[in-house]
Amino acid sequence: VSDLYAFEFHPQAYAPNRDYDGRFGHFDFRRHYYGRIGDFDSKEEFECACWLDTQAQKGRLQFWVRNLVRREGCAFFLQKADGRFYPDFLCQLPGAILAVEYKGADRWKAAEDDRLIGGLWAELSGGRCRFVMVKEKRWDWIEERLL
């Protein structure tokens, strides 16, 4: 993994297909990098975003981004043999980036390739990148990557 092809988020390039409209609940997001937030696929993803924002407000991470899917130029992805993997969230930590994917327990087994490519990306980064896939609100799995 090299910085040669590093992805950068630009404020004017964040263009979600749909903004989050409050359908899973309301939360005063203060640490999302952009003024708008792309919609969440599930209540669990929304709850994960709330947890990340709370950690950012406590100073445990600098900011986070709801990653977009299949949005050229404004989405982060990891290339797989059979397509692309777009983690749900990216978090800026001091000196590192943390990619977080929330996966429902019913889709956990099918997401093994995503876990493997995320783990490989983190392993080859020399400590600059971290990855975690979470299920069943196991926020402690994210907590371990914040240290």
Regions found by a protein language model. Give the residues of each.
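Intrinsically disordered, low-complexity, repeat-rich regions
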Residues: 1-85, 91-96, 102-147
